[in-house]
Amino acid sequence: MRFVKIAIFFIILPYLPYESKAFWGYKITNECRIKKHLFQKKYYLADEKGKMLADGVFEWTITDEYIYGFDGYESEYAVGFIYDRKTKQGENFDHDEFVSECKRLGLEYPSRFDNIYTLQNGLPRVYPLQGE
């Protein structure tokens, strides 16, 4: 009987809602935390109730207005995220959109972001110096 209960648990587990497939996570502010997907090597930004705000957290930066960072795993999907702490909204971006949005908001994007992009795609990112 015990074996049956354990087997049922593992059969049902993959069908749980996406947000529930995580450990408790690391609390980084009063309103959100970084959580790890169960069975994956990926993290995501979640609110206190566990609802996903932005997927793919690899390295992040916290300011008074934003929490932002990037995912170093899948470059063909959204790799950067920005979470607005005032509106409590998060959004994912591809590499170029992420860099543009960081510049638009006056955020300095994480230094390792270009290194991860180079490792995944084999091509370095080149940005013009300020004033050119």
Where are these regions (language model features)?
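Beta-propeller blade signature
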Residues: 83-85
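Repeated scaffold domains used in trafficking and secretory/extracellular systems
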Residues: 54-59, 99-112
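N-terminal export/targeting and maturation segments
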Residues: 12-66, 70-72, 78-81, 90, ...
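Generic detector of ordered, mature protein regions
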Residues: 70-75, 95, 106, 111
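N-terminal Sec-pathway targeting helices
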Residues: 1-10
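Beta-propeller fold detector
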Residues: 91-97
